[in-house]
Every structure is written in C-alpha cells, then in structure tokens.
C-alpha cells in the first residue's frame, strides 16, 4: 500500500455543482467502491426522489447529509490511480461550511475545482479558489461538470472556461498551466477515458490529469511540529496527545516541548493505526506518550516540537489577510477568533498597516482607517492568550489561519513575521 506516493486531494467548488457525485464517480471508476454498493445507493436514492445523488451518497454517509443532500463534515476517502494513491478531502460547499473548507484544504496537496457548466462561476467558486490559494494549494485541475445538462455544448464549455480562467488569473494561478476538462460525473464522461459525447475535446481525461500532478516534497527537513488535536489519559500509559505531524520527524527517545505551556519530556512511544512505530513523519496521524507530561500540561491547540527548537509563541504577529465577508467595516480593536492549525484563539487587530490590491498584491493605501469585504491587507495582530504560530516563510503548515466571527469566516490569511513572547 505504501509503495505508491500519497497525495491529499481537495474537491472544491460551489454548492450543488456536483462535487460529491464527482468524487463518488471517481471512487467507483477506480474500483474503490464496489458496484453493488452503488446499486444499493441508487435504489435508496430513487426511493427518496433523489436518483441523481447515488454517487454522492458514497461521500455523504452521514444521515443528516443524506436528508439535506449537503456535505457537512469533511469525508476522507481513498482511491488509487496507477501512479498515486489519493485521499480525497471532499470539501463542503454550503456557505456555513467554509471553516471546514479551510481546515480541509490546508491538508491538501492539490485540488479539483468543480464548476457546473450550466451555472458557470458562482460566489462560492470564487471564495474556494481564493481560499485554496491563500491556504497554499498550488496545483489545480478544473472540471467543467454537468456537461450532460449543457447538452455537451463546446460553446458553453469555452464560455465557462474563459470565466474560470479570468478568476484564476485574479488570484495568481497561471490559467495556462491548469488543465480544464469537460466532465459529467453523473454520466461518467472524461473521468477515466475520453468521451464520445465531447468529440471536440482532445485533452486528457481526469485520471490522466491526476497522474500528472507532482508530489510535494515532504517537509521532513524542517523542525518537528505537531499541533495537538486532543490529549487522552490512558490507564497504565499516562497522557497520550494525538495529532498530525506537519513538519519534521519525531523519534522515540527524543526530548520534546509543548508550547505555549512549556512542558518538556522524552518521547516514550509513538503509535499509529494501533501499531507501535520508532518514528513518525509528516502526514502521519499519531498518538504519542511523553515521560513526565501530565494531563494538565497538554491541550488542544498546543504544538509539540524539539526541546532545542521549540515552536514560536507569538506576543504579536504580522499577517497578510483577505477579507471574505463582513457586514460593515473592520477597524483597529476588532477581536474575532483566529483558527490556526488546531488552535482557536481570540486575537485583537492592533494596526492596519497597508491595504493591498487583492489581484496584484500591490499597496493601495498606507495605514487605512478600515478594511471591508473584498480587501486584502497587512495587519498587526495580538493574541489575547498565548498562541503558537510560525511565519509561512519558515513553516508554512503553521502559518495559515482563518478568522471567524458571527458564525462565519470573515477572512483568511497567513503569518508574515512573529514577535516572540519573552
């Protein structure tokens, strides 16, 4: 299984543009979902009058999602091509799920943007493309989907392609380097092989485009960083934090420190998939036990690193943000919640240093009095309690964040520099 390189693939795009069906079809065509299961889902979906959702039900396994026909939590599914094995992060499309999208996309190495041919670019198409870019996804494939509903029209395909290309250019993707494919996830067009329904399209099918992706280099040369997702107390063992290794390598016997608490100890054991390992590398989801660490020393949002190169704890930091939505204007003193790796911390906006043109990154205004939806800016931020964050130039995996308030994602951004807590 581990012989093929592994890639995390995000599937993004506006709600109801067919993302879940698309992923279901992909899983089915690569043999990851047995045909009899699809038949069973088809029968169930037909009973509920949602026949076209059969493939989507592979992904939407949560009952509530089935009833609403909406993908809520991020479902992880695996499929193989002859070159890679992929874990699909099916990113939810509805408005209130952007936070999931941010935590989902930040785990992705590449993304497929699904745009429905009849609708073209919609509000969330823009938002997702924008977020993916901010979150550091730089490999993209565009599937212009539901071609069956657009009667396989080449003209319509070209119109949407032009629209999407303009959007990609705005956020800094080179549209010429991005493959565009006309697909119908429901009918299976251009997923595994070229379709007779689109004789005017001579490019590769989706699977070939997936094989053409390049594996990002593993950040195992960077210092060890593991954001803690949870900490458990297990009788006979002690405190076991769990989390995903973002950078570096953890070895048994290593001295590690948890920040911001500062608790330090020696790694006694590392466990993954119920097996003991001598070391853990980036991408591994592990539980590990540290000698001398008690239940109260570690909590969600802490970051584990080497004792001699501990994670940075910010007194203040400078960030580049993009405001996605806000009912009015954002001014100095605003204190929303920042979601960074596994931490959720209220932070105060101390200064708006520069307003940028979101398309080009050029400075539009120095020290503006406010910023609003659609603006990009360089800002100074002060966490209300100690928080680990690293500059994206040093450890990108711990440098990206989302800003939430009033039940919505206000902005996304990245940390440019950190003033360390003394």
Swiss-Prot record:
Keywords: Cytoplasm, Elongation factor, GTP-binding, Hydrolase, Magnesium, Metal-binding, Nucleotide-binding, Protein biosynthesis
Signal peptide range in chain numbering: none
Residues reported to bind GTP: 13-20, 90-94, 145-148
Region (G1): 13-20
One Pfam family it belongs to: GTP_EFTU_D2
InterPro entries registered for this protein in UniProt: EFTu-like_2, G_TR_CS, GTP-eEF1A_C, P-loop_NTPase, Small_GTP-bd, T_Tr_GTP-bd_dom, TRAFAC_GTPase_members, Transl_B-barrel_sf
Region G2: start-end pairs: 69-73
Gene Ontology cellular component terms for the protein in this record: cytoplasm
CDD domains, sorted: EF1_alpha (cd01883), EF1_alpha_II (cd03693), EF1_alpha_III (cd03705)
Catalysed reaction equations from the record: GTP + H2O = GDP + phosphate + H(+)
Enzyme class: hydrolase
Subcellular location field: Cytoplasm
EC number(s) reported in the record: 3.6.5.3
UniProt region (G3), positions on chain: 90-93
Main location: cytoplasm
Entries under NCBIfam families matching the protein: EF-1_alpha, PRK12317.1, small_GTP
HAMAP family per the UniProt record, alphabetical: EF_Tu_A
Family: Belongs to the TRAFAC class translation factor GTPase superfamily. Classic translation factor GTPase family. EF-Tu/EF-1A subfamily.
Full protein name: Elongation factor 1-alpha
The species this protein was found in: Methanococcoides burtonii (strain DSM 6242 / NBRC 107633 / OCM 468 / ACE-M)
